[in-house]
């Protein structure tokens, strides 16, 4: 296969990976955790994956502790957890 063909194949595989949604079997376990604001009192708008609604929702993160189901952007949440 020519180098141009390999580059095309690599590009198509990369595009497929980006556009393929996360399936529940590939979803990290922490995506099932509830939103956890933590004990601190700073107010950071954040996002968490809600497995019941099957989407990322906004919540206020207190700035410390909490859990791994906590994302700065909705896009990051969706690419990690959303199906």
From Swiss-Prot:
Species of provenance: Pseudonaja textilis textilis (Eastern brown snake)
PROSITE patterns: BPTI_KUNITZ_1, BPTI_KUNITZ_2
Coiled-coil parts of chain: none
InterPro entries: Kunitz_BPTI (IPR002223), Kunitz_BPTI_sf (IPR036880), Prtase_inh_Kunz-CS (IPR020901), TFPI/VKTCI-like (IPR050098)
Disulfide-bond pairs as recorded: 31-81, 40-64, 56-77
Protein name: Kunitz-type serine protease inhibitor textilinin-1
Application notes: Could be used in a hydrogel with the procoagulant venom protein ecarin (AC Q90495) to greatly reduce bleeding. Was under preclinical trial by the Australian biopharmaceutical company QRxPharma Ltd, its subsidiary Venomics Pty Ltd (VPL) and the University of Queensland (UQ) under the name textilinin-1 (Q8008). Tested as a potent and selective plasmin inhibitor that has application as an antifibrinolytic agent to reduce blood loss associated with complex surgeries. It is being investigated as an alternative treatment to aprotinin (Trasylol).
Domain BPTI/Kunitz inhibitor: start-end pairs: 31-81
One cellular component (GO) term of this entry: extracellular space
Any one GO molecular function term: serine-type endopeptidase inhibitor activity
GO biological processes: venom-mediated blood coagulation
Other observations noted: Negative results: has no effect on tissue plasminogen inhibitor (tPA/PLAT), urokinase, activated protein C (APC), elastase, factor Xa, alpha-factor XIIa, thrombin, and factor VIIa.
Signal sequence range: 1-24
């Amino acid at each position: 296969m020519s180098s141009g063909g390999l580059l095309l194949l690599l590009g198509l595989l990369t595009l497929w990976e980006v556009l393929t949604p996360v399936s529940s079997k590939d979803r990290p376990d922490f995506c099932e955790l509830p939103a956890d604001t933590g004990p601190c009192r700073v107010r950071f708008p954040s996002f968490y994956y809600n497995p019941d609604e099957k989407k990322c929702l906004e919540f206020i993160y207190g700035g410390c502790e909490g859990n791994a189901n906590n994302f700065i952007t909705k896009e990051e949440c969706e690419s990690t957890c959303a199906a």
